[in-house]
């Protein structure tokens, strides 16, 4: 029912599972080759995920207590901003953003690991004190090829809803060279989330 990065999502015995695409075949059921392939698929579906060698760093935005101390917005910058904020809260649910982002991040971690990714969590509890610069440093040192930050924006205007992604501009002095790849990934994430949930697609904001 789906395929990507060498893995396929298949329906097997009324269950959805992920297997390496190399195990799939168009051989007619009942043949000896089809039997061997099915056995391999069952073993893969029941066994531990096979690593695909890729690392993803996930940052659950904010934390229980903000840190108003200042730090540069980028290496060597004279522009300063608060190290980290505690975030907002749901207009209706009153759920703190830092709790929501950690919950979503843990679910994303599980899904990615099931698909063979190695996941580095920037934080795994709400009671931490990690500045934005420290979070970026952890991600950089992890060797991750993808760094995803999870946030949940909030407005007093309850008519505003949907999902958006943010990425840097092409003229960003620190990582503008990654703009094209970052924009492409951001768009794919937003499009996929909205397709799966029915949320309004608010696109990619370059900032």
PLM ranges: what are they?
Residues 1-5, 40:
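Conserved beta-strand/loop element in small beta-rich adapter and peptidoglycan-binding domains
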Residues 3, 13-15, 22-24, 59-63, ...:
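Solvent-exposed coil/turn segments that connect beta secondary-structure elements
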Residues 11-45:
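Boundary regions of SH3-family modules and the immediately adjacent low-complexity/disordered segments
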Residues 18, 66-68, 128-132, 155-160, ...:
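Extracytoplasmic/secreted cell-surface and envelope-processing proteins
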Residues 40-136, 142, 169:
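Active-site histidine-acidic residue metal-binding/catalytic motifs
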Residues 145:
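Conserved acidic residues
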Residues 195-207:
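Short catalytic/ligand-gating loop segments at beta-alpha or beta-beta junctions
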């Amino acid at each position: 029912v789906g395929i990507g990065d060498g893995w396929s999502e298949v329906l097997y015995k009324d269950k959805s599972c992920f297997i390496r695409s190399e195990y799939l075949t168009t051989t007619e059921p009942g043949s000896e080759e089809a039997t061997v392939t099915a056995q391999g698929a069952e073993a893969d579906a029941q066994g531990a995920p096979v690593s695909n060698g890729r690392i993803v760093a996930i940052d659950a935005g904010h934390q229980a207590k903000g840190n108003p101390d200042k730090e540069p917005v980028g290496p060597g910058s004279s522009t300063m901003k608060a190290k980290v904020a505690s975030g907002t809260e749901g207009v209706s649910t009153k759920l703190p953003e830092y709790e929501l982002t950690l919950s979503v991040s843990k679910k994303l971690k599980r899904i990615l690991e099931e698909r063979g990714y190695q996941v580095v969590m920037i934080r795994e509890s709400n009671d931490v004190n990690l500045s934005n610069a420290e979070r970026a440093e952890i991600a950089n040192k992890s060797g991750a090829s993808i760094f995803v930050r999870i946030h949940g924006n909030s407005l007093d205007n309850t008519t505003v809803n949907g999902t958006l992604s943010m990425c840097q501009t092409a003229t960003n002095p620190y990582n503008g060279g990654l703009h094209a790849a970052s924009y492409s990934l951001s768009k794919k994430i937003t499009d996929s989330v909205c397709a799966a949930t029915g949320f309004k697609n608010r696109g990619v904001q370059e900032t």
